[in-house]
Amino acid sequence: MYHLWIKCLAAWIFLKRFNGVHVMHAKAPMYPNEPFLVFWNAPTTQCRLRYKVDLDLKTFHIVANANDTLSGSAVTIFYPTHLGIYPHIDDRGHFFHGIIPQNESLTKHLDKSKSDINRIIPLKTFHGLGVIDWENWRPQWDRNWGNKNVYRNRSIQFARDLHPELSENKIRRLAKAEYEKAAKSFMRDTLLLAEEMRPDGYWGYYLYPDCQNYDYKTKGDQYTGKCPDIEMSRNDQLLWLWRESTALFPNVYLEIILRSSDNALKFVHHRLKESMRIASMAREDYALPVFVYARPFYAYTFEPLTQEDLVTTVGETAAMGAAGIVFWGSMQYASTVDSCQKVKKYMNGPLGRYIINVTTAAKICSHALCRKNGRCVRKHSDSNAFLHLFPESFRIMVHANATEKKVIVKGKLELENLIYLRENFMCQCYQGWQGLYCEEYSIKDIRKI
């Protein structure tokens, strides 16, 4: 009886300490002792090769492809025309491959996809991010609103042509069922093929999950940022997709209307919160790694994020427990020498220094709190605790000469710093480790790895 009471007390302390939140194990980081990674996924090759402008990505510990290409060993993104025969209508109204998934051969698509993967990712030991960017239609019928409604209309006409004898209600039901079945097969089987061919990669679809919390334009001060219940329910229905994914790739692109506003943080926070929820429900043994797509400039502009919005995007992403952030950019970044210099100036200023701040702080917390065997995650997801270097204890120093540039972080973690981390963060242990501070081997988890 005494031992039972002790066990109950320990369980109560555990739940109270961690706010009653069950934290699943995490997959070990892509690179050892790097709990939070920053990737560069912008086509800035011309800056280096044509304009001789080095963006100094390595200086600030940013993971990038060779020569800063859009696709390579670190991250490869597949657009609609790059992988298989993806049926869709493009932004200019051009039709491709039967338009709707039920009107195209899945077998032909997978055969072409196999060839494309071998061509674009020749390395069979590919260990980077494999991102499939299919945004033209969504696999759920009810989510094809607005300009995507054309896929519903085409599906209805397709069913009507095949079954003219059916009533209109039956045709609509049939169209929905056939569309969702074919869309699911296209997305699921493409993912399975990619994972079979390049099993060490981190595979998933860009903008999945989404939570459709874009109503900041109409709500103003009434905006909460919360994902609508119906959208969270629809995400639950995509369990088949989450189970086959090996990573999630949501986005937190900020429009300029959100610049340095409370709404920006609400927008980002709830998108991340939903992504972490999905990551924890996909599998029984570990939470999927979440790599969050962001832009270093406001969407549809060439204006850099403010310091406040760097915290809102990069800082919030790290504090919520994501595995990393991926900076996406357009051809505009490398369109002229002036564009390249603008990106470089921002990189050598607020952007680069903040990246060093957060990635180093995440590593320090992992070392100090989680014995290097886990990553630090907010105890209370809605708190304003961030993984930042303590300014009274650490300094970021940049040393440059004619041939190279180095960033050095000097300082040490003081007792009061450690107390702050323990009060505000908890450990999400990597597979193979357990305990409050990931200090114990977990034989059960090791066998699953």
Swiss-Prot record:
Expressed by the venom gland. It is found in: Secreted. It catalyses: Random hydrolysis of (1->4)-linkages between N-acetyl-beta-D-glucosamine and D-glucuronate residues in hyaluronate. Pfam families: Glyco_hydro_56. Residues 1-23 form the signal peptide. The keyword Lyase does not apply. Disulfide bonds join C47-C340, C211-C227, C365-C376, C370-C427, C429-C438. GO terms for molecular function: hyalurononglucosaminidase activity. GO terms for biological process: carbohydrate metabolic process; hyaluronan catabolic process. It comes from the Eukaryota. The keyword Electron transport does not apply. The active site is at E135 (proton donor). Residues 427-438 form the EGF-like domain. Its main location: secreted. Keywords: Disulfide bond, EGF-like domain, Glycoprotein, Glycosidase, Hydrolase, Secreted, Signal. GO terms for cellular component: cytoplasmic vesicle; extracellular region. Glycans are attached at N67, N103, N153, N357, N401. Its EC number is 3.2.1.35. Belongs to the glycosyl hydrolase 56 family. Snake venom endo-hyaluronidase that degrades hyaluronan to smaller oligosaccharide fragments. In venom, it is not toxic by itself, but increases the diffusion of other venom proteins by degrading the extracellular matrix. In addition, it displays antiedematogenic activity. Monomer. This is Hyaluronidase. It comes from Echis ocellatus (Ocellated saw-scaled viper). The lineage of its organism: Eukaryota, Metazoa, Chordata, Craniata, Vertebrata.
